[in-house]
A protein has these predicted regions:
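Short beta-strand scaffold segments in enzyme catalytic cores
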Residues: 2-9, 84
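Zn2+-dependent cytidine deaminase-like catalytic core
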Residues: 16-109
């Protein structure tokens, strides 16, 4: 399954990501690759992310972040952060992180 994304930072820089599949250990998703690249370069303010993917190079369908990535992203963005999902028929669907994860976990929930 192929996934790629582009993360737009408020600084104007764009960080790309792709999923990396492994046989023996947990794989990493494109969204987390892009965010960790950006964060490691000092970025902290994010505009939006564009995500596309599919089960072959010839077929790209709507591709939404998995639950792990939704939680991960929610810890670095505000609730209005936009996620744009691309499809193979040139359709772009816009979501906010809150649309996809309305009840994210925060460390403050433990107190």
């Amino acid at each position: 399954y192929y996934v790629g994304c582009a993360l737009m930072c408020k600084s104007g820089k764009i960080y790309s990501g792709c999923n990396i599949e492994n046989d023996g250990i947990q794989s990493i998703c494109a969204e987390r690759v892009a965010f960790t690249k950006a964060i490691s370069e000092g970025e902290r303010d994010f505009e939006y992310i564009v995500v596309c993917g599919g089960d072959s190079l010839d077929y790209l369908d709507d591709c939404l972040p998995c639950g792990y990535c939704r939680q991960f992203m929610s810890e670095f963005v505000d609730k209005d952060f936009k996620i744009y999902a691309l499809s193979n028929n040139d359709k772009v669907t816009e979501y906010s992180i809150f649309d996809l994860l309305p009840n994210n976990f925060r460390l403050t929930h433990l107190s």
